[in-house]
UniProtKB/Swiss-Prot annotation:
HAMAP family: TtcA
Species assigned in the record: Herminiimonas arsenicoxydans
Name of this protein: tRNA-cytidine(32) 2-sulfurtransferase
Organism ancestry: Bacteria, Pseudomonadati, Pseudomonadota, Betaproteobacteria, Burkholderiales
Function: Catalyzes the ATP-dependent 2-thiolation of cytidine in position 32 of tRNA, to form 2-thiocytidine (s(2)C32). The sulfur atoms are provided by the cysteine/cysteine desulfurase (IscS) system.
Pathway: tRNA modification
Length: 318
Protein backbone atom coordinates (compact mmCIF):
# COMPACT_ATOMS: atom_id res chain seq x y z
CA UNK A 1 0.00 0.00 0.00
CA UNK A 2 1.43 3.35 -1.05
CA UNK A 3 2.07 6.13 1.48
CA UNK A 4 -0.45 8.39 -0.29
CA UNK A 5 -3.21 5.80 0.19
CA UNK A 6 -2.31 5.48 3.87
CA UNK A 7 -2.40 9.25 4.28
CA UNK A 8 -5.81 9.49 2.58
CA UNK A 9 -7.16 6.74 4.81
CA UNK A 10 -5.87 8.53 7.87
CA UNK A 11 -7.43 11.81 6.78
CA UNK A 12 -10.80 10.18 6.13
CA UNK A 13 -10.75 8.11 9.34
CA UNK A 14 -13.84 8.66 11.48
CA UNK A 15 -13.67 10.76 14.61
CA UNK A 16 -14.32 7.62 16.66
CA UNK A 17 -10.95 6.20 15.59
CA UNK A 18 -9.12 9.33 16.67
CA UNK A 19 -11.00 9.30 19.96
CA UNK A 20 -10.09 5.64 20.51
CA UNK A 21 -6.41 6.37 19.85
CA UNK A 22 -6.54 9.33 22.21
CA UNK A 23 -8.16 7.16 24.89
CA UNK A 24 -5.46 4.50 24.54
CA UNK A 25 -2.75 7.14 24.78
CA UNK A 26 -4.40 8.49 27.91
CA UNK A 27 -4.55 5.00 29.41
CA UNK A 28 -0.85 4.51 28.69
CA UNK A 29 0.03 7.80 30.37
CA UNK A 30 -2.01 6.88 33.44
CA UNK A 31 -0.34 3.47 33.53
CA UNK A 32 3.18 4.94 33.30
CA UNK A 33 2.39 7.54 35.96
CA UNK A 34 1.07 4.89 38.33
CA UNK A 35 4.14 2.77 37.68
CA UNK A 36 6.40 5.69 38.58
CA UNK A 37 4.48 6.33 41.80
CA UNK A 38 4.74 2.66 42.78
CA UNK A 39 8.47 2.64 42.01
CA UNK A 40 9.07 5.71 44.16
CA UNK A 41 7.07 4.22 47.03
CA UNK A 42 8.97 0.95 46.73
CA UNK A 43 12.40 2.60 46.62
CA UNK A 44 11.67 4.97 49.50
CA UNK A 45 10.16 2.13 51.51
CA UNK A 46 13.20 -0.03 50.84
CA UNK A 47 15.60 2.71 51.94
CA UNK A 48 13.58 3.28 55.11
CA UNK A 49 13.69 -0.45 55.87
CA UNK A 50 17.34 -1.01 54.93
CA UNK A 51 18.59 1.74 57.23
CA UNK A 52 15.84 1.72 59.88
CA UNK A 53 15.10 5.36 59.12
CA UNK A 54 11.63 5.57 60.65
CA UNK A 55 10.45 3.83 63.81
CA UNK A 56 7.16 3.51 65.60
CA UNK A 57 6.21 6.78 67.29
CA UNK A 58 8.64 8.94 65.32
CA UNK A 59 7.88 12.52 64.45
CA UNK A 60 9.49 13.23 61.08
CA UNK A 61 10.40 16.82 60.27
CA UNK A 62 10.39 17.01 56.46
CA UNK A 63 12.50 19.93 55.28
CA UNK A 64 10.59 21.50 52.41
CA UNK A 65 12.54 23.93 50.22
CA UNK A 66 10.00 24.28 47.44
CA UNK A 67 12.11 22.22 45.04
CA UNK A 68 11.03 19.08 43.20
CA UNK A 69 12.89 16.68 45.49
CA UNK A 70 11.52 17.86 48.82
CA UNK A 71 7.99 17.98 47.38
CA UNK A 72 8.38 14.39 46.16
CA UNK A 73 9.76 13.33 49.53
CA UNK A 74 6.81 14.79 51.42
CA UNK A 75 4.29 13.31 48.99
CA UNK A 76 5.74 9.78 49.12
CA UNK A 77 6.15 9.81 52.91
CA UNK A 78 2.49 10.79 53.26
CA UNK A 79 1.52 7.86 51.04
CA UNK A 80 3.69 5.41 52.97
CA UNK A 81 2.37 6.66 56.30
CA UNK A 82 -1.12 5.51 55.31
CA UNK A 83 0.17 2.01 54.51
CA UNK A 84 2.84 1.55 57.17
CA UNK A 85 2.42 -1.05 59.93
CA UNK A 86 3.84 1.52 62.36
CA UNK A 87 2.57 4.92 63.39
CA UNK A 88 4.60 8.05 62.74
CA UNK A 89 3.80 11.73 62.38
CA UNK A 90 4.93 14.23 59.77
CA UNK A 91 5.52 17.95 60.12
CA UNK A 92 6.67 19.97 57.12
CA UNK A 93 9.13 22.79 57.76
CA UNK A 94 10.27 25.54 55.44
CA UNK A 95 13.01 28.03 56.22
CA UNK A 96 12.22 31.41 54.67
CA UNK A 97 15.67 32.98 54.41
CA UNK A 98 14.30 36.27 53.07
CA UNK A 99 15.82 35.91 49.64
CA UNK A 100 14.74 38.54 47.10
CA UNK A 101 11.47 37.74 45.32
CA UNK A 102 10.85 34.62 47.41
CA UNK A 103 7.14 33.79 46.93
CA UNK A 104 6.33 33.33 50.60
CA UNK A 105 2.65 32.56 49.96
CA UNK A 106 3.21 29.41 47.86
CA UNK A 107 4.23 26.87 50.49
CA UNK A 108 1.66 27.81 53.16
CA UNK A 109 -1.12 27.62 50.56
CA UNK A 110 0.09 24.25 49.30
CA UNK A 111 0.53 22.76 52.78
CA UNK A 112 -2.90 23.93 53.93
CA UNK A 113 -4.40 21.97 51.03
CA UNK A 114 -2.60 18.84 52.25
CA UNK A 115 -4.03 19.33 55.72
CA UNK A 116 -0.81 18.41 57.53
CA UNK A 117 1.03 20.24 60.32
CA UNK A 118 3.64 22.67 59.04
CA UNK A 119 5.89 25.44 60.27
CA UNK A 120 7.43 28.35 58.36
CA UNK A 121 10.61 29.60 60.04
CA UNK A 122 11.50 33.18 59.13
CA UNK A 123 15.22 33.95 59.42
CA UNK A 124 17.07 36.56 57.37
CA UNK A 125 20.19 34.53 56.64
CA UNK A 126 20.36 36.07 53.17
CA UNK A 127 21.56 39.42 54.55
CA UNK A 128 24.19 37.69 56.70
CA UNK A 129 25.55 35.72 53.75
CA UNK A 130 25.64 38.74 51.44
CA UNK A 131 27.51 40.73 54.07
CA UNK A 132 30.17 38.07 54.64
CA UNK A 133 30.69 36.58 51.16
CA UNK A 134 32.34 38.71 48.42
CA UNK A 135 30.27 39.48 45.34
CA UNK A 136 30.50 36.78 42.69
CA UNK A 137 31.58 34.03 45.09
CA UNK A 138 29.38 31.05 45.86
CA UNK A 139 27.40 31.45 49.05
CA UNK A 140 26.16 27.86 49.30
CA UNK A 141 28.59 26.66 51.97
CA UNK A 142 27.91 29.41 54.52
CA UNK A 143 24.20 29.42 53.71
CA UNK A 144 24.07 25.67 54.30
CA UNK A 145 25.77 25.94 57.70
CA UNK A 146 23.41 28.69 58.84
CA UNK A 147 20.39 26.77 57.57
CA UNK A 148 21.52 23.58 59.28
CA UNK A 149 21.85 25.23 62.68
CA UNK A 150 18.41 26.82 62.40
CA UNK A 151 16.75 23.56 61.35
CA UNK A 152 18.33 21.71 64.28
CA UNK A 153 16.87 24.29 66.65
CA UNK A 154 13.45 24.07 65.00
CA UNK A 155 13.54 20.27 65.26
CA UNK A 156 14.07 20.60 69.01
CA UNK A 157 11.25 23.11 69.34
CA UNK A 158 8.83 20.90 67.40
CA UNK A 159 9.83 17.72 69.20
CA UNK A 160 10.93 16.03 65.97
CA UNK A 161 12.78 12.74 66.38
CA UNK A 162 14.11 12.59 62.80
CA UNK A 163 14.98 15.24 60.20
CA UNK A 164 14.21 14.14 56.62
CA UNK A 165 16.10 15.72 53.71
CA UNK A 166 15.33 15.39 50.01
CA UNK A 167 18.73 14.30 48.69
CA UNK A 168 18.42 11.57 46.05
CA UNK A 169 20.70 8.99 44.49
CA UNK A 170 22.30 11.47 42.09
CA UNK A 171 23.17 13.81 44.97
CA UNK A 172 24.85 10.93 46.80
CA UNK A 173 26.88 9.93 43.73
CA UNK A 174 27.92 13.50 42.97
CA UNK A 175 29.02 14.09 46.56
CA UNK A 176 31.07 10.88 46.52
CA UNK A 177 33.04 11.99 43.46
CA UNK A 178 33.31 15.60 44.66
CA UNK A 179 35.00 14.39 47.84
CA UNK A 180 37.25 12.05 45.89
CA UNK A 181 38.31 14.46 43.14
CA UNK A 182 38.48 17.71 45.10
CA UNK A 183 38.80 16.61 48.74
CA UNK A 184 40.99 13.49 48.48
CA UNK A 185 38.52 11.49 50.57
CA UNK A 186 36.42 8.38 50.07
CA UNK A 187 33.34 9.98 51.56
CA UNK A 188 29.77 10.17 50.37
CA UNK A 189 26.41 11.35 51.61
CA UNK A 190 25.01 8.73 54.01
CA UNK A 191 21.33 7.76 53.99
CA UNK A 192 21.24 8.13 57.77
CA UNK A 193 23.56 9.94 60.14
CA UNK A 194 23.89 11.60 63.49
CA UNK A 195 23.96 15.38 63.17
CA UNK A 196 27.18 17.23 63.90
CA UNK A 197 25.71 18.57 67.13
CA UNK A 198 25.10 14.99 68.27
CA UNK A 199 21.44 15.62 69.06
CA UNK A 200 19.58 14.63 65.91
CA UNK A 201 19.21 11.81 63.41
CA UNK A 202 19.09 12.97 59.79
CA UNK A 203 17.58 10.67 57.16
CA UNK A 204 17.52 10.70 53.36
CA UNK A 205 14.60 8.48 52.30
CA UNK A 206 15.17 9.28 48.59
CA UNK A 207 18.61 7.63 48.71
CA UNK A 208 17.62 4.99 46.11
CA UNK A 209 15.63 7.38 43.88
CA UNK A 210 17.04 8.79 40.64
CA UNK A 211 16.75 12.51 40.00
CA UNK A 212 15.10 11.85 36.63
CA UNK A 213 12.23 10.21 38.50
CA UNK A 214 11.71 13.13 40.88
CA UNK A 215 11.75 15.49 37.90
CA UNK A 216 9.05 13.53 36.11
CA UNK A 217 7.04 13.03 39.29
CA UNK A 218 7.07 16.78 39.96
CA UNK A 219 5.67 17.39 36.47
CA UNK A 220 2.95 14.79 36.94
CA UNK A 221 1.92 16.14 40.34
CA UNK A 222 2.27 19.75 39.20
CA UNK A 223 4.10 20.79 42.35
CA UNK A 224 4.37 24.60 42.78
CA UNK A 225 8.14 24.71 42.29
CA UNK A 226 10.07 27.63 43.77
CA UNK A 227 13.30 28.52 41.87
CA UNK A 228 16.50 27.66 43.72
CA UNK A 229 18.56 30.56 42.36
CA UNK A 230 16.75 33.46 44.02
CA UNK A 231 19.82 34.23 46.13
CA UNK A 232 21.86 34.98 43.01
CA UNK A 233 24.68 32.66 44.11
CA UNK A 234 27.07 31.37 41.48
CA UNK A 235 26.49 27.79 40.39
CA UNK A 236 28.74 25.16 41.95
CA UNK A 237 30.88 24.45 38.90
CA UNK A 238 32.61 21.45 40.47
CA UNK A 239 29.29 19.72 41.14
CA UNK A 240 28.17 20.58 37.62
CA UNK A 241 31.29 18.91 36.23
CA UNK A 242 30.56 15.75 38.20
CA UNK A 243 26.90 15.75 37.16
CA UNK A 244 27.88 16.05 33.49
CA UNK A 245 30.48 13.29 33.88
CA UNK A 246 27.93 10.88 35.36
CA UNK A 247 25.38 11.68 32.66
CA UNK A 248 27.99 11.06 29.97
CA UNK A 249 28.93 7.74 31.54
CA UNK A 250 25.29 6.70 31.73
CA UNK A 251 24.86 7.56 28.06
CA UNK A 252 28.03 5.85 26.79
CA UNK A 253 28.29 3.01 29.29
CA UNK A 254 24.83 1.93 30.51
CA UNK A 255 25.03 0.25 33.89
CA UNK A 256 28.30 1.85 34.97
CA UNK A 257 26.67 4.40 37.28
CA UNK A 258 24.42 1.70 38.76
CA UNK A 259 27.50 -0.40 39.55
CA UNK A 260 29.28 2.53 41.17
CA UNK A 261 26.24 3.25 43.32
CA UNK A 262 26.03 -0.40 44.36
CA UNK A 263 29.72 -0.33 45.30
CA UNK A 264 28.98 2.27 47.98
CA UNK A 265 27.25 -0.46 49.99
CA UNK A 266 29.83 -3.20 49.30
CA UNK A 267 33.02 -1.69 50.71
CA UNK A 268 36.01 -3.94 51.50
CA UNK A 269 38.19 -2.02 54.01
CA UNK A 270 40.97 -4.65 53.87
CA UNK A 271 41.47 -3.78 50.21
CA UNK A 272 41.80 -0.05 50.66
CA UNK A 273 44.60 1.84 52.43
CA UNK A 274 43.02 3.38 55.52
CA UNK A 275 44.67 1.99 58.65
CA UNK A 276 41.86 3.46 60.74
CA UNK A 277 39.43 1.06 59.07
CA UNK A 278 41.65 -2.01 58.91
CA UNK A 279 44.55 -3.11 61.12
CA UNK A 280 47.26 -3.46 58.49
CA UNK A 281 50.03 -2.85 61.05
CA UNK A 282 48.94 -5.79 63.21
CA UNK A 283 48.19 -8.16 60.34
CA UNK A 284 49.92 -11.54 60.73
CA UNK A 285 49.71 -14.84 58.89
CA UNK A 286 47.56 -17.20 60.96
CA UNK A 287 48.30 -20.38 59.05
CA UNK A 288 44.57 -20.97 58.72
CA UNK A 289 43.09 -20.98 55.24
CA UNK A 290 40.24 -18.54 54.67
CA UNK A 291 37.58 -20.03 52.34
CA UNK A 292 36.49 -16.58 51.23
CA UNK A 293 39.92 -15.01 51.37
CA UNK A 294 41.60 -13.39 48.39
CA UNK A 295 44.71 -14.67 46.68
CA UNK A 296 47.80 -12.48 46.80
CA UNK A 297 48.24 -12.15 43.07
CA UNK A 298 44.86 -11.44 41.55
CA UNK A 299 44.36 -11.98 37.87
CA UNK A 300 43.41 -8.99 35.80
CA UNK A 301 39.61 -8.66 36.19
CA UNK A 302 39.14 -7.95 32.49
CA UNK A 303 41.64 -10.41 31.01
CA UNK A 304 39.09 -12.43 29.06
CA UNK A 305 39.15 -13.54 25.48
CA UNK A 306 36.85 -10.71 24.48
CA UNK A 307 39.17 -8.03 25.82
CA UNK A 308 42.63 -9.39 25.00
CA UNK A 309 42.85 -7.19 21.92
CA UNK A 310 42.41 -4.07 24.04
CA UNK A 311 45.48 -4.78 26.21
CA UNK A 312 48.32 -2.34 25.52
CA UNK A 313 51.58 -4.27 25.00
CA UNK A 314 54.68 -3.27 26.95
CA UNK A 315 57.38 -1.51 24.98
CA UNK A 316 60.42 -3.73 24.44
CA UNK A 317 63.94 -2.38 24.67
CA UNK A 318 65.92 -2.25 21.43
Amino acid sequence: MSQSVINEAAISAPAETAAALSFKQGEKIVYENNKLHKRLCRQVGQAIGDFNMIEDGDKIMVCLSGGKDSYALLDILMTLRERAPIKFDIVAVNLDQKQPNFPEHILPAYLKQLDIPFHIENQDTYSIVKRLIPEGKTTCSLCSRLRRGILYRVADELGATKIALGHHRDDIMETFFLNMFFGAKIKGMPPKLQSDDGKHIVIRPLAYVKEADTERYAQIKNFPIIPCDLCGSQENLQRKQIKNMLREWEKKHPGRVDNIFSSLSTVVPSHLMDSNLFGFADLQATGVAMPNGDIAFDEEPCSTGSTISSVIPLRTED
